Amino acid sequence: LVFFTRSLYDLITGLLDQWIKRFSCGEMQYDPKTNSKLRVFHAWGAKEQPGLYRIICEHHGKRPGTVQNTNERQPNRGLIDLSKRLLEEITIEPMFDAILIDEGQDLVAEDDLKYQDKQAIYWLAYQSLRPADSEHPEQKRLIWAYDEAQSLDSLKIPTAPELFGIDTNLNKAVTGSYKGGIKKSEIMRRCYRTPGQILTSAHAIGMGLLRPEGMLTGLTNQKAWKEIGYEVVGDSKFISGRQITLRRPPENSPNPISEIWGKPVLEFETYGSRQEEMKALAEKIMHNIVHDGLNPSRDILVVILGSTYEAMELETQIAGFLMEYDIDVYIPTALKLNDLVPQYPNHDPDKFWHEGGVTVSRITRAKGHEADMVYVVGFDNVARNENDVNFRNQLFVALTRARGWANLSGVGSYPMYEEMRKVIASGESFTFTYKRPPKRDIGDSE
């Protein structure tokens, strides 16, 4: 089982243990230290924590590359660069029976890093697999899951043609059904974690559906919208100048919090200064802990938006401010609470939560995690770049970490703030004018 965000180890091993116990009626459990047949890896790997790329290198007697061995600045592009080089240097021998890839959208890059028109990491994984059927050696157990709306770096979507290029046999491998009727591709239209009001708002603001200049990214046909849980009201086709109405039926958002709570579960507030924003944040978190009975760790999460530099700076600033309010904080990878700048070697890259502290995290480490109450801070860092799809994806990822409630805040005044207010006011139905094809059409699924 492979994933990209290293801080997910605790969550994924916990879920494996939970569901193995469930399906074995308590007779089996998962312990990563003793179970050698089911391995959990992050995609890259390190000396103290094996990963897919590193394990494959070592199996073939090759020295694994590190961040120092690539000129790529983004971690995922660095890994893809090294995977491409490995494929160019050696022939990969089969060593696994099955590979399941989560966060598949983070393991693709632009065409300049492809290996023979294929996405390098996926081809590396495919080559390292034993055939599932000796008579059909091209059939291998490579399973990947992705959410294109959560891509923070690349606009590529991990469809079979994108991953495997012009190889028609592999492209057909994910179409149709297996014997017995099991679909080879499954699109999840129902969301259990995030309340409907938050999910629809995250989709709308992430895609820019109510953006005055027109949507930036999204789907442009009824079938594709239906597949992710929406209805296109009427017989509307996505033609320039035509009005489109989308609705998400309640059965596709079964999280009951909105109905039980009876009040908005998504709030958006703006402030005249960062100081005001942080003061309001501290007071709300203190109220959650003292009056609402939420635990600081795992129940509450603060997610920081912005570019790498902006988010790092704001993360430290907000964590320090919360400490002044006697709120213990945890910065992911730190070995203890209230360590605002954890650094190698005194850090733990696998760690995201710490008992007794509110986790304050940049979006890249928050991916995959969830909490009852999520505070999304620094909306202004996105609003200044409102026509950037990756920045909007940050907003989508941050809001959908919420199991119950989300609070979004920013400073200053930007046109995107008014767009957000319209999104929230629209509820679970959106009406907009389709103006032109989006920068990124994510409806090209298999």
Question: Where are each of the predicted segments found?
Answer:
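Post-kinase regulatory C-tail/linker adjacent to protein kinase catalytic domains
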Residues: P32-T34, L219-I228, P437-R440
